[in-house]
């Protein structure tokens, strides 16, 4: 029973903040909470402050406009894995590419949340009936993004979201929109994204809405020399079923081959300090480079989350 409660606690955030009374009424009324779980070790290592950076394939989650800034001559493949407490895991694969001579960039991605089989319980057998059920979420998305000027880009996702709970299965469609603006001073960028627009899941007696999240943030180069760069980022987000949140992050890069990151998730019930590191290394056989990144996130009373990412360019 304790293990099941931990799983539920990891997937549903409770209310906090100045508007807690109002927010509390909304907690539990939204489904698809896994859609709020950030992907990508680089972004997580920076405390999730990534809406105004979004310059790798994980932009399909943080800000689809960022896909427009990937190299037109490269095809990007990114694999992400997240391990949460209580045997919860999230996996994602992203493929980003240019389609012929059509302006802009495209991407497709698949994501799945899995939980170890859970025991079936009833009023007479609270310790379990001896049977087990499986549960999980999955989503499949397509992204298009384009730079309209040398400073402004925009992008959009369309996602098919699926819930599997033993014999109960539901699907819904959601949309994401994002913009990026390059201020042109000190590498400063401003990013804005709306995630999970639309989408409802019909349960037996009620409908549950997918959580639409608003994100806005800014990033800038704090230090930029020939061999070193320090990137800072700030983000504000507003989920529909919890208090407003702040994210701060920083990334130090040495010659674009070694990376150290740190960040903070503020006003989160189950996430706090974050840190990470990454390396870029050559793959001689493919005549290209790859990135490997790791991030640690303190989950407070739940333990810790670990994220791993691999990115390869062709």
Regions found by a protein language model. Give the residues of each.
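Positively charged n-region of N-terminal signal peptides that target proteins for export
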Residues: 1-4, 150
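Sec-dependent N-terminal signal peptides
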Residues: 4-13
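Subset of outer-membrane beta-barrel
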Residues: 21-314
């Amino acid at each position: 029973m304790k293990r099941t409660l931990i799983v539920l606690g990891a997937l549903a955030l409770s209310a906090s903040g100045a508007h807690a009374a109002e927010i509390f009424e909304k907690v539990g009324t939204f489904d698809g909470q896994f859609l709020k779980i950030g992907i990508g070790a680089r972004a997580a290592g920076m405390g999730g402050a990534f809406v105004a950076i979004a310059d790798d394939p994980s932009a399909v989650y943080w800000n689809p406009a960022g896909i427009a800034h990937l190299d037109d001559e490269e095809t990007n493949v990114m694999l992400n894995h997240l391990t949460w407490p209580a045997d919860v895991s999230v996996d994602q694969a992203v493929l980003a590419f240019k389609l012929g001579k059509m302006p802009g960039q495209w991407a497709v991605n698949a994501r799945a949340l899995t939980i170890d089989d859970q025991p079936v319980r009833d009023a007479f057998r609270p310790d379990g009936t001896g049977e087990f059920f499986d549960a999980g979420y999955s989503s499949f998305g397509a992204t298009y993004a384009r730079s309209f000027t040398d400073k402004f880009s925009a992008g959009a996702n369309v996602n098919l979201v699926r819930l599997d709970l033993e014999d109960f299965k539901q699907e819904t469609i959601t949309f994401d929109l994002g913009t990026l603006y390059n201020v042109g001073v000190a590498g400063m960028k401003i990013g804005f994204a709306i995630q999970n627009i639309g989408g409802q899941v019909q349960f037996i007696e009620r409908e549950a809405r997918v959580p639409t999240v608003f994100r806005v943030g800014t990033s800038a180069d704090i230090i930029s020399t020939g061999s070193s760069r320090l990137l800072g980022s700030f983000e504000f987000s507003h989920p529909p079923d919890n208090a407003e949140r702040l994210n701060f992050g920083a990334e130090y890069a040495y010659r674009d081959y070694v990376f150290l990151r740190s960040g903070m998730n503020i006003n989160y019930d189950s996430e706090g300090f974050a840190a990470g590191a990454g390396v870029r290394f050559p793959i001689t056989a493919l005549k290209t480079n790859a990135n490997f990144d790791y991030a640690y996130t303190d989950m407070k009373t739940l333990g810790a989350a670990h994220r791993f990412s691999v990115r390869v360019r062709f």
